[in-house]
C-alpha cells in the first residue's frame, strides 16, 4: 500500500516540499537561513498575535497598553521581548540569506530572486510599522521622518503624505492604520514565501560550487531536516540569550518615553537593521535624491542578475570577486555604524564615501573584476 503522505492531496504537497524533495548533496550551512527565516516568521506571527490581544491602537492608550503587557500580563514581558528581538534575528537571517545568494550566484534563479526582493521590501515595511506601535518618542518621530520622505515625490508628494497620515500630522488615524497593516502584512509575507518556494522548487536549489546537481541529489528528510534543526537550535539559543539577558540591547532608550509631538529627540534613528539605508539617505544633501538612493540601495539587488559577467556562477573559485564581496560587506557594516551617528564631521564624509563605494562596487567594480577573472581563466 502506498504511503498516505504520497497520495493525500494536501500531504503530497508537504511531502514534495519538505520530505522527498531532491536536494543537492553538498549544500552548506549557508543554506540553513531559508528555514530559519520561516521559523522567525512563525515566532513573529505567534508572539504578535498574543501581543495584539492586549494592545490598543489609540494614541492615548498605546504606550500604556505596552507597559501593561510587560507588567501585568502573564509572561507578557517575554512575549513582547521575543517579538522585538525576534525582528532583529529575522533581519540578521535575511541579510545573511541575501549575502549567500550574492556570493554563490543564486540570483541566476531570477524568479526566486525577484520574489525575494519583494519579500525584503514587505518585511521592511512591516518592521517599520511595528516600530511605530509602542508610541514612544522614537516611534512617533521615526514615523514622522520616514513618512515625510514621500513628500519629496514631485507634484503629488504632500497629498500622498497627508493621505497616509490620515490628517495633517502623525496622529490617531496613522497609528490605527499602521496597526491594521502591521497585522495583515505578515500573512501577505506568508503567501509570498509560498510563491518564493514554488519558484525555487521549479528549478531546485543552487549549491556552493554553482554547478548543476541533477546527477547527485539526496532526499531532504532526514539529511537536511536534521541540519535545519541544528540551525534552529542555534537561532533559538541566540534569541533567548538576547531576550533573557539584555532585551533592550538593540532598542532605543528614547522609546521608553511616551510620544511627545512638542519635543524632538536629539538623534532620530531607526532600528539597527535600517541604519545602512538611513546612512545612504542622509549622505545625499537633496531630499528627492536621498529618497531615490534609499530605494535604490535595496532595488539594486534586482539588477544584479543583469550585471553577472562572470563565466562561473559561484564565487567559490573567484578570489578577486571574493575580496570585493567582503569589501562590500565591510562597507555595509560601516554604513550601519554611520547611520547611528549624529550628522556632523567626520561622520557625514565617511557616510558619503561609503555610499559611493556601495553603489560603485555593485554596479561597476564587481562586474569589471569578473571580466578580469574570465581573462585569467585563459592564462
Curated annotation (Swiss-Prot):
<dbReference type="InterPro" id="IPR030689">
    <property type="entry name" value="Cytochrome_b"/>
</dbReference>
<feature type="transmembrane region" description="Helical">
    <location>
        <begin position="113"/>
        <end position="133"/>
    </location>
</feature>
<dbReference type="GO" id="GO:0008121">
    <property type="term" value="F:ubiquinol-cytochrome-c reductase activity"/>
</dbReference>
<comment type="similarity">
    <text>Belongs to the cytochrome b family.</text>
</comment>
<dbReference type="InterPro" id="IPR005797">
    <property type="entry name" value="Cyt_b/b6_N"/>
</dbReference>
<feature type="binding site" description="axial binding residue">
    <location>
        <position position="196"/>
    </location>
    <ligand>
        <name>heme b b566</name>
    </ligand>
</feature>
<feature type="transmembrane region" description="Helical">
    <location>
        <begin position="226"/>
        <end position="246"/>
    </location>
</feature>
<dbReference type="GO" id="GO:0005743">
    <property type="term" value="C:mitochondrial inner membrane"/>
</dbReference>
<keyword id="KW-0999">Mitochondrion inner membrane</keyword>
<dbReference type="InterPro" id="IPR048259">
    <property type="entry name" value="Cytochrome_b_N_euk/bac"/>
</dbReference>
<feature type="transmembrane region" description="Helical">
    <location>
        <begin position="178"/>
        <end position="198"/>
    </location>
</feature>
<dbReference type="GO" id="GO:0045275">
    <property type="term" value="C:respiratory chain complex III"/>
</dbReference>
<feature type="binding site">
    <location>
        <position position="201"/>
    </location>
    <ligand>
        <name>a ubiquinone</name>
    </ligand>
</feature>
<feature type="transmembrane region" description="Helical">
    <location>
        <begin position="33"/>
        <end position="53"/>
    </location>
</feature>
<keyword id="KW-0679">Respiratory chain</keyword>
<dbReference type="GO" id="GO:0006122">
    <property type="term" value="P:mitochondrial electron transport, ubiquinol to cytochrome c"/>
</dbReference>
<keyword id="KW-0812">Transmembrane</keyword>
<keyword id="KW-0813">Transport</keyword>
<dbReference type="InterPro" id="IPR048260">
    <property type="entry name" value="Cytochrome_b_C_euk/bac"/>
</dbReference>
<feature type="transmembrane region" description="Helical">
    <location>
        <begin position="288"/>
        <end position="308"/>
    </location>
</feature>
<feature type="binding site" description="axial binding residue">
    <location>
        <position position="83"/>
    </location>
    <ligand>
        <name>heme b b562</name>
    </ligand>
</feature>
<comment type="function">
    <text>Component of the ubiquinol-cytochrome c reductase complex (complex III or cytochrome b-c1 complex) that is part of the mitochondrial respiratory chain. The b-c1 complex mediates electron transfer from ubiquinol to cytochrome c. Contributes to the generation of a proton gradient across the mitochondrial membrane that is then used for ATP synthesis.</text>
</comment>
<dbReference type="Pfam" id="PF00032">
    <property type="entry name" value="Cytochrom_B_C"/>
</dbReference>
<keyword id="KW-0496">Mitochondrion</keyword>
<dbReference type="Pfam" id="PF00033">
    <property type="entry name" value="Cytochrome_B"/>
</dbReference>
<feature type="transmembrane region" description="Helical">
    <location>
        <begin position="320"/>
        <end position="340"/>
    </location>
</feature>
<feature type="transmembrane region" description="Helical">
    <location>
        <begin position="347"/>
        <end position="367"/>
    </location>
</feature>
<keyword id="KW-0408">Iron</keyword>
<keyword id="KW-0472">Membrane</keyword>
<dbReference type="InterPro" id="IPR016174">
    <property type="entry name" value="Di-haem_cyt_TM"/>
</dbReference>
<feature type="binding site" description="axial binding residue">
    <location>
        <position position="182"/>
    </location>
    <ligand>
        <name>heme b b562</name>
    </ligand>
</feature>
<keyword id="KW-0479">Metal-binding</keyword>
<dbReference type="InterPro" id="IPR027387">
    <property type="entry name" value="Cytb/b6-like_sf"/>
</dbReference>
<dbReference type="InterPro" id="IPR036150">
    <property type="entry name" value="Cyt_b/b6_C_sf"/>
</dbReference>
<dbReference type="InterPro" id="IPR005798">
    <property type="entry name" value="Cyt_b/b6_C"/>
</dbReference>
<protein>
    <recommendedName>
        <fullName>Cytochrome b</fullName>
    </recommendedName>
</protein>
<keyword id="KW-0349">Heme</keyword>
<dbReference type="GO" id="GO:0046872">
    <property type="term" value="F:metal ion binding"/>
</dbReference>
<feature type="transmembrane region" description="Helical">
    <location>
        <begin position="77"/>
        <end position="98"/>
    </location>
</feature>
<keyword id="KW-0830">Ubiquinone</keyword>
<keyword id="KW-1133">Transmembrane helix</keyword>
<keyword id="KW-0249">Electron transport</keyword>
Amino acid at each position: 500500500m502506498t504511503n498516505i503522505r504520497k497520495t493525500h492531496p494536501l500531504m503530497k504537497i508537504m511531502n514534495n516540499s519538505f520530505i522527498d524533495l531532491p536536494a543537492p548533496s553538498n549544500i552548506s550551512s549557508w543554506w540553513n537561513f531559508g528555514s530559519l527565516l520561516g521559523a522567525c516568521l512563525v515566532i513573529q506571527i505567534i508572539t504578535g498575535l498574543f501581543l495584539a490581544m492586549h494592545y490598543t491602537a489609540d494614541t492615548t492608550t498605546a504606550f500604556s497598553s505596552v507597559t501593561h503587557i510587560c507588567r501585568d500580563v502573564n509572561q507578557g514581558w517575554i512575549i513582547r521581548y521575543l517579538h522585538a528581538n525576534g525582528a532583529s534575528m529575522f533581519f540578521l537571517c535575511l541579510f545573511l540569506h541575501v549575502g549567500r545568494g550574492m556570493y554563490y550566484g543564486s540570483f541566476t534563479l531570477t524568479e526566486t530572486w525577484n520574489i525575494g526582493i519583494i519579500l525584503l521590501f514587505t518585511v521592511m515595511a512591516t518592521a517599520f510599522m511595528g516600530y511605530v506601535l509602542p508610541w514612544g518618542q522614537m516611534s512617533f518621530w521615526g514615523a514622522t521622518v520616514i513618512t515625510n520622505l514621500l513628500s519629496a515625490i514631485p507634484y503629488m508628494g504632500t497629498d500622498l503624505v497627508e493621505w497616509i497620515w490620515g490628517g495633517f500630522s502623525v496622529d490617531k488615524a496613522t497609528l490605527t492604520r499602521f496597526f491594521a497593516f502591521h497585522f495583515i502584512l505578515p500573512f501577505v509575507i506568508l503567501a509570498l514565501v509560498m510563491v518564493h518556494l514554488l519558484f525555487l522548487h521549479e528549478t531546485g536549489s543552487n549549491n556552493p560550487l554553482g554547478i548543476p546537481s541533477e546527477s547527485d541529489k539526496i532526499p531532504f528528510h532526514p539529511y537536511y531536516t536534521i541540519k535545519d534543526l541544528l540551525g534552529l537550535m542555534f537561532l533559538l539559543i541566540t534569541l533567548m540569550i538576547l531576550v533573557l539577558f539584555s532585551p533592550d540591547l538593540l532598542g532605543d532608550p528614547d522609546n521608553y518615553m511616551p510620544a511627545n509631538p512638542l519635543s524632538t529627540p536629539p538623534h532620530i534613528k531607526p532600528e539597527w537593521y535600517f541604519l545602512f539605508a538611513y546612512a545612504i539617505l542622509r549622505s545625499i544633501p537633496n531630499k528627492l535624491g536621498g529618497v531615490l538612493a534609499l530605494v535604490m540601495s535595496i532595488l539594486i539587488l534586482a539588477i544584479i542578475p543583469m550585471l553577472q559577467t562572470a563565466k562561473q556562477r559561484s564565487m567559490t573559485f573567484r578570489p578577486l570577486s571574493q575580496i570585493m564581496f567582503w569589501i562590500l560587506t565591510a562597507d555595509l557594516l560601516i554604513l550601519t555604524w554611520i547611520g547611528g551617528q549624529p550628522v556632523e564631521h567626520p561622520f557625514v564624509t565617511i557616510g558619503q564615501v561609503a555610499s559611493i563605494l556601495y553603489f560603485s562596487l555593485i554596479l561597476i567594480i564587481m562586474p569589471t573584476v569578473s571580466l578580469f577573472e574570465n581573462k585569467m581563466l585563459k592564462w
